[in-house]
Amino acid sequence: MKRLLLVLCAAVIAVPAFGQSVSVKDGNIQFTDKSGQTTALTSSGRDSGPVLAPDGKWVVFVRKVDGKPIATGSEEVEPTELWQVRVDGKEATLLVKTRDTGKPETGIAAFGSLQFSTSGKLVYFVTPAWAVTGAVYVVDTTNRKVRYLFPGSDVKVVSSGEYKDHLLVLQHRYFIGGGSYDWYWLVRSDGKEIGPVGETTENFEATHSE
């Protein structure tokens, strides 16, 4: 009897535990559920950069498209689109297209540093813009409205704690006496600055995460 119990316990311990995740294979987005089963969500062969929403129900990703390269203050970028799809592969929706307007505050050249708000409703991203920094935008996934927020080369959403849903933004700034520096700053989602964080976000995350 004891031997049987030991065998049963060993069998229970040996059962692998999986978390939901997303990946890319041959240019297609894949979703792996909690049981470890992987399903292809797209079939274009041109998709990359998937990010899973906090509720585990939606995925955003970037799709390559044909078209003229988009000029920015730092480089030329091949056109892409930002899409979302449910984890069951249904309701694939185009959210934002790249656009060349000649102005950093309105032009969108790429979709980097994709970050969901904790509600999963908003998606923040960074696009190349000026010579020394990018531009941070946000799109509402429920109505596809997109707007420019502020300059920045990286953006992170604070997922918990006192500053939940605030943003950590890497910005290029200048010293009064000359020279420049790149620091992360804590800002509200409406753009109001809270204060400096530093060259990295490690200390902030260690102090202000639940």
Language model features by range: what are they?
Residues 4-13:
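Sec-dependent N-terminal signal peptides
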Residues 17-210:
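Sequence signature of WD/YWTD-type beta-propeller architectures
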